[in-house]
Design a protein with these regions (language model features):
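Structured alpha-helical subdomains that flank or immediately precede key functional sites
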Residues: 1-176
Length: 176
């Protein structure tokens, strides 16, 4: 959902550029990038939290993401074209008109993200708002049963400052 938001926001940010602009072309060629950096993961964990596998088990789609990714890319390209078309049809003149149009496009983006969320929830399951987790010792005996939200589980069991406690080391030979 975060990557979808980045793509759609990129479309809004490039709304006035021509369709054959290199940046616009790149966005439509790469609506969902594969992978990412450690900081992206740490940001997601900090924002949303985490759940144990027992609270949200794997699905067919989570183990086979290519079909889901293809569907999401098609949907995002369609939505990106709809945003660009809405801007082109309105053809706002002046800064105030453009700012008003951006607000309309951002409102459309929120509706589009709801569709993306629905696709993700159908493929991966609805993330639990709250769950009960049973902790067992090495003998399999129950030690505790607690209720958590994804963020409270993250705070209790990860409790690392992933944003400030680590640095990212990277080698990118193509930049040399």
């Amino acid at each position: 959902i975060e990557k979808a938001n980045l793509f759609l926001q990129g479309i809004i940010d490039t709304r006035a550029l021509p369709d054959d602009d290199r940046q616009v072309d790149w966005l439509f060629s790469n609506p969902l990038s594969d992978g990412g950096q450690f900081t992206g993961v740490s940001d997601l964990l900090t924002k949303y939290g985490v759940v144990p596998a027992e609270a949200m088990p794997e699905t067919f789609c989570s183990n086979n993401t290519s079909q889901m990714a293809m569907l999401l890319k098609l949907k995002l390209r369609e939505d990106g074209l709809r945003l660009r078309q809405a801007y082109a049809e309105a053809a706002p003149k002046g800064k105030k008109a453009d700012e008003a149009m951006v607000k309309k496009l951002e409102s459309k983006k929120i509706e589009m993200l709801k569709d993306i969320y629905r696709i993700l929830a159908l493929c991966l399951g609805e993330p639990p708002a709250e769950f009960e987790w049973t902790r067992c010792n090495s003998k399999g005996e129950i030690v505790s049963v607690e209720k958590f939200t994804p963020k409270s589980f993250y705070s209790k069991y990860i409790s690392e400052d992933l944003e400030n406690g680590y640095i990212m080391v990277m080698n990118d030979p193509c930049r040399e």
